[in-house]
Design a protein with these regions (language model features):
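Catalytic helix-loop patch of NAD(P)-dependent Rossmann-fold dehydrogenases
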Residues: 21-72, 77, 83-84, 88
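Single conserved hydrophobic/aromatic residue that forms the stacking wall/gate
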Residues: 1-11
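Conserved short acidic donor-positioning loop in nucleotide-sugar-dependent glycosyltransferases
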Residues: 20, 96, 147
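Alpha-helical segments that scaffold the active site and NAD(P)H-binding pocket
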Residues: 60-65, 97-101, 134
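C-terminal substrate-binding subdomain of Rossmann-fold SDR/epimerase-dehydratase oxidoreductases
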Residues: 102-217
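Active-site loop of short-chain dehydrogenase/reductase
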Residues: 12-14, 26-27, 67-69, 106, ...
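Conserved active-site helix of classical SDR/Rossmann-fold NAD(P)-dependent CH-OH oxidoreductases
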Residues: 53-60, 93-98, 126-127, 153
Length: 217
């Protein structure tokens, strides 16, 4: 259906949302836009990573056939309000927010707590996607993320502080924690958008998420 509707000028520019999960666990701490099929996707999200790889490949082929300007974005750890809560399958921030607000005590987090990730609020992600679509450069492949990282232990403590909760925090080192540091090289992204990447701080974003959760659950 996409390939047939793409014949219209309305569809001559498309954006496909991939994921940073396509990248392998090996490589630098700050990941640039790497080759799509370089080694296997990260182990903790391997199925999802492969699905996104094939999505990129499929739409890249269709865009060439239909002469479409295809923008492919690879977001890193996006969070925000209106998140779909799916229990143990939720990503880190929404899962921790829910468990802390549900008064789970002790609170058990996976891994050592020292693993570091970069996080970007959904507002900034959507804003950046809009700027990418407005950019005249064709056939863009770009990461959406930041170089700045925060440890899981610090993330837990921030959520507890903002929510006014004080559970006993335990870290289960028998559970997988993925690569130790995962962040995004922002060189290409900064060139494309010509604007700041982060406008919603991690503290402000978590506060928004907590308030939304309280109002809706």
């Amino acid at each position: 259906q996409w390939s047939s509707s793409a014949a219209s000028d309305v569809y001559k520019r498309q954006l496909i949302t991939s994921s940073s999960c396509i990248y392998s666990d090996e490589g630098p701490d700050s990941l640039g836009e790497r080759y799509l099929f370089e080694k296997e996707p990260e182990k903790v999200n391997m199925g999802y990573g492969w699905a996104k790889r094939f999505l990129e490949q499929k739409f890249s082929i269709l865009s060439k056939i239909n002469n479409i300007d295809l923008k492919i974005v690879r977001p890193f750890n996006i969070y925000g309000e209106r998140y779909k809560w799916v229990g143990g399958y939720s990503s880190a921030i929404p899962m921790l927010v829910k468990r802390i607000l549900d008064d789970e005590n002790p609170l058990i987090a996976w891994g050592s707590g020292n693993q570091r990730r970069s996080y970007l609020h959904a507002f900034d992600c959507a804003r950046i996607m809009h700027l990418i679509m407005e950019n005249p450069k064709k056939n863009i492949v770009v990461n959406i993320g930041t170089k700045e990282t925060i440890s899981v232990s610090d993330l837990v403590r921030i959520i507890c502080k903002i929510s006014g909760k004080d559970p006993t925090i335990l870290f289960d080192k028998t559970k997988p924690e993925g690569r130790f540091i995962k962040s995004s090289d922002t060189t290409i992204l900064s060139e494309i958008i010509g604007d700041e990447i982060i406008t919603v701080s991690i503290e402000e974003g978590i506060k928004k998420m907590i308030n939304w959760y309280i109002e809706n659950f």
